[in-house]
A protein has these predicted regions:
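Solvent-exposed soluble domains appended to multi-pass membrane proteins
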Residues: 1-102
Length: 102
């Protein structure tokens, strides 16, 4: 629950510091929300953090590229961006990160 709590609190820096411990926590695959968070972090922080022995699913990278494209298209109007992204990505970590108020 430690890593999930970091995501709920939108603490991506501490999440990225601790993601190498994924195997220590018993994971054999990167959970989808962890993967989404790490792809977002790597993109916006210009990093290449991937836990040893793990890889990103191509479909998640493709979804992120689609998300980023829609966000870029509507970024001048946050309400419209939220609406458009919500149509397809409402259940993604990316949407939570950018639009959920905690």
């Amino acid at each position: 629950y430690f890593l999930a709590t970091l995501l709920l609190n939108k603490d991506l820096d501490f999440f990225a510091e601790n993601i190498p411990r994924l195997k220590d926590f018993g994971y054999t695959d990167i959970p989808l929300y962890f993967e989404e968070a790490l792809i977002f972090y790597n993109f916006y922080e210009n990093k290449q953090i991937i836990p040893e022995g793990f890889s990103f699913r191509p479909e998640t990278i493709a979804r992120f590229n689609e998300y980023a494209g829609i966000y870029t298209k509507f970024r001048s109007d946050r309400a419209v961006a939220r609406f458009e992204l919500g149509k397809k990505f409402r259940n993604s970590y990316w949407y939570y990160l950018q639009f959920a108020i905690i």
